[in-house]
Amino acid sequence: VIISSRCVGIDVSKHHLDIFDEAVGVSERIDNATHAITQLVARWRCDALVVFEATGVYDLELREALHRAGIRFARINPARARDFARASGQLAKTDPIDAQMLAAFARAMKPATEQAATPARNALAKLAKRRDQLVAMRAQEKNRRSEAEDRAMAERIARLIEVLNDEIAEIETEINALVKAEPELADDAQLMRSVPGVGPVACMQLLTQMPELGRLGPKEVAALAGLAPFNVDSGAYRGKRKIGGGRKRVRDALYMAALNAIRRADRFKAFYDRLRQAGKPAKLALIAVARKLLTILNAMLRDRKIYKVAPST
C-alpha cells in the first residue's frame, strides 16, 4: 500500500466541486469545468490520494485531469461513504462536510485506486450509459403497452417502442465500431467473448465499468463488482453472508452472464449444480457463478490468454 502524504475529498455535483484538502484544512468550491479543474489538480503532487463518490458522467472531467497529472484517485459507492460518516458520528450532510468526510475516509480506509480510463473507454462509457437509459425507457413503454386501455393507445405506444428499438440498434452499431477501431478494446473484447455466457452486453459493461480488470487480484475485483460476500455476525449470532456495494452495472451484467453460462457450459453448470445440491439457494449459487466468471475474466486479461474449455470442477 502506498502511504499518501496528502488525502483530498471531493464532493461532485453537476455544476461545482466541493474540495477538502487535509494538508491545508480548508474547504473550497470551484466550478465543475475543465479550466478550474486543471488549475486545482496542478496544486497536488503524485503522492496525493483523491477520493470522491461515483456520480456517473459528472466526475468525468475530474477523472481525466487526475489521470493526466498522474494522481491516484478512488471512486467509492455513495452508501459506503455515508456509512463511514455515520460510524464517525457525523450525521449532518452538506457538500463541504461530505468533502471533509471523504478526505477522512481516504486516510482511514486507504481505498483501492481506480485505473484511469482511456479516451476511447470514456467515449464507450457514454454510449453504454445512453443505451442503458434507452433500454430502461423501452421496458417502461412495454409495461404501459400491456396496460393500455384500448387498441389505439397500444398501437401508439408500439410506435414509440419501435423508435427506441431503432435508436438502441444505432447506438449498438456505434459501440461495435468503436470497439473494433481501438486495438486495446478489440483485444479485451475478444478475450471476454471467448468465455461461455459473456455476450455483447456483459462485455460492454466490463469494458466501460471495470478498467481495472486484469490489473488487480481476484478478491479486489470481486469487491469492486460488489460480488465479495461479507459477514453479518454479532456475538453468538451468525447471519447469512451477503453481497452489496460495488458497481451495480457490472454485477447485474455478470449475473445475466452466469445465467447464460450454466445453460451453455458444462463447467459452470456442474459448479452451479454442486452448490444447489449442497443446499445453497438458487440466487446465491448464481452469484457464486458470477464471481467465478469474474475471477476467470480477470486472470485471462492479466495473462492475455483466451478461454479454454476445462473439465468440470
Predicted regions and their residues:
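Gly/Thr-rich phosphate-binding beta-strand-loop-beta motif of the actin/hexokinase/Hsp70
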Residues: 2-22, 102, 134, 204-205
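Nucleic-acid-processing active sites and adjacent nucleic-acid-binding tracks
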Residues: 24-49
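Long, charge-rich intrinsically disordered scaffolds of nucleic-acid metabolism proteins
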Residues: 3, 67, 74-194, 204
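Short, glycine/acidic-enriched loop or turn micro-motifs at the edges of active sites
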Residues: 14, 56, 80, 208
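Phosphate-backbone recognition surface of nucleic-acid-processing proteins
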Residues: 200, 205-278, 282, 309
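Basic, amphipathic alpha-helical segments enriched in Lys/Arg and hydrophobic/aromatic residues
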Residues: 277-313
